[in-house]
Amino acid sequence: MTVKVHVVYCGGUGYRPKFIKLKTLLEDEFPNELEITGEGTPSTTGWLEVEVNGKLVHSKKNGDGFVDSDSKMQKIMTAIEQAMGK
């Protein structure tokens, strides 16, 4: 089963490289198992929101910050594994 990961990031802030890095890390960890999409906001929002199958699992807007630590990455990977039924 393909798991959908959607990332909304601040396009006005130049966060696209952060999205690309996250996408690459997740594709390396879960090859051919994810459908990853990204959406840059046209204005400066400061957002970096990660949804797994429609469920918000990481939100910079709500205080999670960037995905810049192993524990933050693990939270996203755990949500993906749960969505896969692992």
From Swiss-Prot:
Keyword Cytoplasm among UniProt keywords: yes
SUPFAM superfamilies to which the protein is assigned, alphabetical: Thioredoxin-like (SSF52833)
Subcellular location: Cytoplasm
Matching Gene3D superfamilies: Glutaredoxin (3.40.30.10)
Keywords: Antioxidant, Cytoplasm, Redox-active center, Selenocysteine
BP-aspect Gene Ontology terms: response to selenium ion
Residues in cross-link Cysteinyl-selenocysteine (Cys-Sec): C10-U13
Pfam families xrefs: Rdx
Keyword DNA-binding: no
GO molecular function, one term: antioxidant activity
GO CC list: cytosol
UniProt function note: Plays a role as a glutathione (GSH)-dependent antioxidant. May be involved in a redox-related process. May play a role in the myopathies of selenium deficiency.
UniProt similarity note: Belongs to the SelWTH family. Selenoprotein W subfamily.
Descriptive protein name: Selenoprotein W
